[in-house]
């Protein structure tokens, strides 16, 4: 999972920010329980601050600082994906029409499959958000929701972590 630019100075003005934060927390908890890869990006952290502390994983994640809007232009990030043999990016964060869109479009061009968590991304302006979603899906990105992707990752109720996963969803 790729969490893009959830920094305090940016998120203040995001539409539906409380819901976005709540869903990213659910995703983080599920990803940590299921021991899935977590990557975090920060756009110009010296000016925009760092990732909101409550949205940092407990352990086992990689953080990338960037100046380009697209994380997919950062060689260090691309090397990490290659080393971990990751070809499907699950994306959440802000802002849909800037850093998310540029990262997604560049990733699709590089051959990655991209899934957008529609209820865990946002922009300041809903028109920008909606148009960016349309552009990314027309380019090949897949839309899903927080709950859907969590159950997709879990795969079965027989999995030992299922009860914990169900509890995350029910919160």
Q: At which residue positions do the language-model features occur?
A:
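N-terminal nucleotide-binding beta1-loop-alpha1 segment
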Residues: 1-6
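Short acidic, Gly/Ser-rich segments with clustered Asp/Glu that frequently serve as metal-coordination loops
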Residues: 8-13
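A short alpha/beta connector and helix-capping loop motif
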Residues: 14-40, 45
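Active-site-adjacent betaalpha module
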Residues: 33, 46-171
């Amino acid at each position: 999972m790729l969490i893009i630019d959830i920094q305090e100075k940016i998120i203040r003005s995001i539409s539906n920010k409380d819901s976005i934060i709540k869903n990213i927390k659910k995703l983080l908890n599920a990803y940590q329980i299921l021991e899935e890869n977590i990557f975090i990006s920060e756009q110009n952290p010296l000016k925009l601050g760092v990732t909101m502390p409550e949205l940092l994983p407990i352990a086992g994640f990689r953080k990338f600082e960037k100046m380009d809007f697209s994380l997919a232009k950062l060689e260090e990030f691309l090397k990490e994906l290659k080393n971990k043999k990751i070809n499907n990016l699950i994306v959440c964060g802000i802002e849909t029409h800037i850093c998310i869109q540029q990262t997604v479009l560049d990733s699709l061009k590089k051959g990655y499959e991209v899934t957008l968590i529609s209820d865990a991304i946002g922009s300041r302006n809903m028109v920008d958000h909606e148009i960016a979603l349309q552009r990314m899906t027309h380019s090949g990105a897949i839309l899903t929701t927080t709950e859907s992707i969590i159950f997709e990752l879990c795969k079965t109720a027989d999995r030992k972590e299922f009860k914990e996963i169900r509890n995350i969803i029910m919160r």
